[in-house]
C-alpha cells in the first residue's frame, strides 16, 4: 500500500543550534549539510536569536535591536545556500525575538505581546528576512515567526491577543 500525505510536507532533519546564542560564531561547515543530505534527511531548522545578528548593546534600550551585523546575516545566508545545494529545506525560526525569549530567565527589554516598540522591532526583523530571501521558494525555505508563543505561562511570554505574529505574517509570505 502506498501512503501519500495530504497537505503539508513531512520533513525529517535536524536543529542546528549555533545561531541561538551570541556566545559562538554560528558557522556550520558546508560538509554538515552534505552529510545530512547523504544520510537521507531533507530538513534543517535554524533556531535563531535576534541577538546573534544584531550588534548588541544595552538591553534596556530598543536601539541596539535595529543595529544589524551583516557578517552574522551572511552566515545565515550560507546555511540557506547550503540547503539549496544539498536539497534540504531550511526553516528559519525566531527562538528569541525582540520582546520575546522562550528561555526562562533571559532578559528582554520589552514585551512582544504588550509593547508596541517590541511589535515594531519584531516586524522590522521579519521584514528584513522576507526581503533578503524573497526569491527563494517556500518549497526550499520556510519561516517560523516565533517559537512556541504560548508554551510558557509567564505573563511576559504569553500572548493574550495573538496580534504580533499576525502583523508579521504578510512580510513572511
Language-model features: locations:
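N-terminal carbohydrate-binding accessory modules
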Residues: 1-45, 58-60
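Short, well-ordered coil/turn segments that N-cap beta-strands
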Residues: 7-12, 40-42, 84-90, 135-141, ...
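Active-site beta-loop-alpha junctions enriched in small/polar residues
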Residues: 16-19, 49-51, 95-97, 146-148
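Acidic-and-aromatic substrate-binding clefts and catalytic sites of carbohydrate-active enzymes
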Residues: 20-28, 52-54, 69-70, 120, ...
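Surface-exposed, active-site-proximal loop segments in enzymatic domains
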Residues: 52-72, 98-117
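Active-site region of glycoside hydrolase catalytic domains
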Residues: 104, 113-173
Amino acid at each position: 500500500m502506498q501512503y501519500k500525505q495530504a497537505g503539508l510536507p513531512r520533513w525529517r532533519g535536524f536543529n542546528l543550534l549555533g545561531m541561538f546564542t551570541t556566545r559562538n560564531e554560528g558557522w556550520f561547515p558546508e560538509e554538515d549539510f552534505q552529510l545530512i543530505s547523504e544520510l537521507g534527511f531533507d530538513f534543517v531548522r535554524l533556531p535563531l536569536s535576534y541577538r546573534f545578528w544584531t550588534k548588541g548593546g544595552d538591553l534596556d534600550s530598543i536601539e541596539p535591536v535595529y543595529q544589524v551585523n551583516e557578517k552574522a546575516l551572511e552566515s545565515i545566508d550560507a546555511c540557506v545556500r547550503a540547503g539549496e545545494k544539498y536539497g534540504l529545506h531550511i526553516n528559519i525560526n525566531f527562538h528569541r525575538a525582540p520582546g520575546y525569549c522562550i528561555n526562562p530567565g533571559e532578559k528582554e527589554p520589552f514585551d512582544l505581546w504588550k509593547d508596541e516598540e517590541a511589535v515594531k522591532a519584531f516586524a522590522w526583523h521579519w521584514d528584513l528576512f522576507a526581503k533578503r530571501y524573497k526569491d527563494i521558494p517556500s518549497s526550499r525555505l520556510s519561516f517560523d515567526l516565533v517559537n512556541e508563543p504560548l508554551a510558557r505561562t509567564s505573563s511576559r511570554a504569553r500572548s493574550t491577543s495573538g496580534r504580533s505574529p499576525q502583523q508579521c505574517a504578510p512580510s513572511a509570505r
